[in-house]
Amino acid sequence: MAAPIVRTMTSLPRPTAELSADEARRIALRAQGFLGAPDRRGGVRGVLRHLGAVQLDTISVLARSHELVPYARLGAVGRRTVDEAYWTPAPVGTAPPRPHAFEYWSHAACILPVEEWPHFAFRRRAYRARPHWNHALPDGTYDQVIKQLRAEGPLTATDLGGAKKTSEWWDWSGTKVAVERALMYGEVVCTERRGWKRVYDLAERAIPEALLHDDLDDTECLRRLVRLAGRSLGVGTRADIADYHRLRNDQVDAVIADSGLVPVTVQGWGKPAWADPEALETTPRGRHRTTLLSPFDSLVWDRARTERIFGFTHRLEAYVPKPKRVYGYFAMPVLAGGRLVGRVDPSREGTTLVAKQVTLDSPKSVPAVAQALLEAATWVNCTTIRVDRANTPLLRDTLTTTLNKSL
């Protein structure tokens, strides 16, 4: 058998364009939906299609991350509108409508456009071929879960007879382990949630027939995902592109030449980069969004990229012991004028939005942070805003005064 051909990065194509760091930043902002008029007609589903993946997380401060992502781009979007856009429930007694999205492992646990189902065939195959899992399953548990879903229709883990014993993943029941494994294999899918609980169904019943296949080989899956990641990023290094859907660098290397992305150089990056050719056709212009960002937003979820593009060091501290936190439990980066200008660690107390800690790079950012807090307060039905701490007492007083003038 002939040895497989492996492409490496030792020989790189000539760059088709040279971008300044500022041009790359604006291309990235536009690609992520933060430059120009919001696509309100496309709405939440348009945001999902544009980004290709929206990360899920259980933390809920102002809102959950999958709600914060469309809010950051569109403004005040009703939570029911968000949930219905992602998870359209099937009417009782009728055939399920075509789902708009499904949940799967991408950058992390994510909501993905249903059209991307075929692209993850490579990952489903890898999971099926995996020899070891963290949990051993009792004999017959997996088959029983599939049999029950086939007979009874879409069910939560509780409906199946076994959710988590505790909140920790390592203490899942056998049924929960089985249904989650079936989801990773692609035999089961989640296209709906009820009260934040996943609703599981057979993929053959929930995924549209035209998409329900694993026909794409691994190379084609990777090529498409690299192309989509490049489009969603606008411009990125190999590591940026790989991180978007958690691919390996060698997987990106193997397909990037055939992905449709074009090689570019970006001043100051010091690494080869690739761009979406459509992103290079027009100069990024338009109005910038001023908003709070979820730490799980795809604009900032890659720490190395965020630091390179924005000069902003970002780290989620929710899992850091409280005495060691620098910026707060759920510090949200503040985007204003196309730059990250500070952080706000928010919470809610009744109808009061509390900025537990505000960290700003400059007093000049106070008006933008005040605007972001006022919009967020309106969105979550808070009528007052309180600033507990800032990185200097003067900043706290100035921000409080600015907010009081607008409330």
Regions found by a protein language model. Give the residues of each.
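Long, charged, low-complexity, helical-prone intrinsically disordered regions
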Residues: A2-L407
